[in-house]
UniProtKB/Swiss-Prot annotation:
DNA-binding stretch(es), residue numbering of this chain: 28-48
InterPro entries assigned to the protein according to its UniProt record, in alphabetical order: LexA (IPR006200), LexA-like (IPR039418), LexA/Signal_pep-like_sf (IPR036286), LexA_DNA-bd_dom (IPR006199), LexA_repressor (IPR050077), Peptidase_S24_LexA (IPR006197), Peptidase_S24_S26A/B/C (IPR015927), WH-like_DNA-bd_sf (IPR036388)
Organism in which the protein naturally occurs: Yersinia enterocolitica serotype O:8 / biotype 1B (strain NCTC 13174 / 8081)
Name recorded for this polypeptide: LexA repressor
Free-text function comment from the UniProt entry: Represses a number of genes involved in the response to DNA damage (SOS response), including recA and lexA. Binds to the 16 bp palindromic sequence 5'-CTGTATATATATACAG-3'. In the presence of single-stranded DNA, RecA interacts with LexA causing an autocatalytic cleavage which disrupts the DNA-binding part of LexA, leading to derepression of the SOS regulon and eventually DNA repair.
Site-annotated residues for Cleavage: 84-85
SUPFAM superfamilies, alphabetized: LexA/Signal peptidase (SSF51306), Winged helix' DNA-binding domain (SSF46785)
Pfam families named in the record: LexA_DNA_bind, Peptidase_S24
EC number: 3.4.21.88
Gene name of the encoded protein: lexA
Oligomer status and interactors: Homodimer.
Length: 202
């Protein structure tokens, strides 16, 4: 399958989501309206491009004649090693998909992150575990978060006071990471909501 352009991906996502929500694909006019195209003909051109790339099939003679061919992966994306400067959920970081029900976690998990190291050992997060993560930036002091400092991704307990963030380990052999928000790039990628070890939720 050939890679999709950003616009083609938007059209594909719209068709997929419309199917999931209503049970039928959108019309060309609906696609044009939702994505700001000037006419349904522009939507038709994008659909033809998607058909050429093998991700949809256009069924002639029907205003909603669109069939998805590209199978969506089941389960939660598993994030492995993250390259510097790239989004955590970039396609190249996804090692695979893990068949687990996101709703078994509260709040529900959006992705899994492979744990690297033993800095959170004392609360049962071990090297090689799969950490279930709810994607959000709405977190509170004391919660275990997935954070990005400059280009490093880490799992720690959050303590924020003014412009200073401390990321606290749960292992006395490790030192806290101190971040000055005035000098360093800092992003919360999500909230830890559970751990999977050897295929079992614990």
């Amino acid at each position: 399958m050939k890679a999709l352009t950003t616009r083609q991906q938007e059209v594909y996502d719209l068709v997929r989501d419309h199917l999931a929500q209503t049970g039928m694909p959108p019309t060309r006019a609906e696609i044009a309206q939702r994505l700001g195209f000037r006419s349904p003909n522009a939507a038709e051109e994008h659909l033809k491009a998607l058909a050429r790339k093998g991700v949809i099939e256009i069924v002639s003679g029907a205003s909603r004649g669109i069939r998805l061919l590209m199978e969506e992966e089941d389960g939660l994306p598993l994030i492995g090693r993250v390259a510097a400067g790239e989004p955590l959920l970039a396609q190249q970081h996804i090692e695979g998909h893990y068949k687990v029900d996101p709703s078994m976690f509260k709040p529900s998990a959006d992705f899994l992150l492979r744990v690297n190291g033993m800095s959170m050992r004392d609360i049962g997060i071990l090297d090689g575990d799969l950490l279930a993560v709810h994607k959000t930036q709405d977190v509170r002091n004391g919660q275990v978060v997935v954070a990005r400092i400059d280009d490093e991704v880490t799992v720690k307990r959050l303590k924020k006071q003014g412009n200073i963030v401390q990321l606290l380990p749960e292992n006395s052999e490790f030192q806290p990471i101190v971040v000055d928000l005035r000098e360093q790039s800092f992003t919360i990628e999500g909230l830890a909501v559970g751990v999977i070890r050897n295929g079992d939720w614990i």
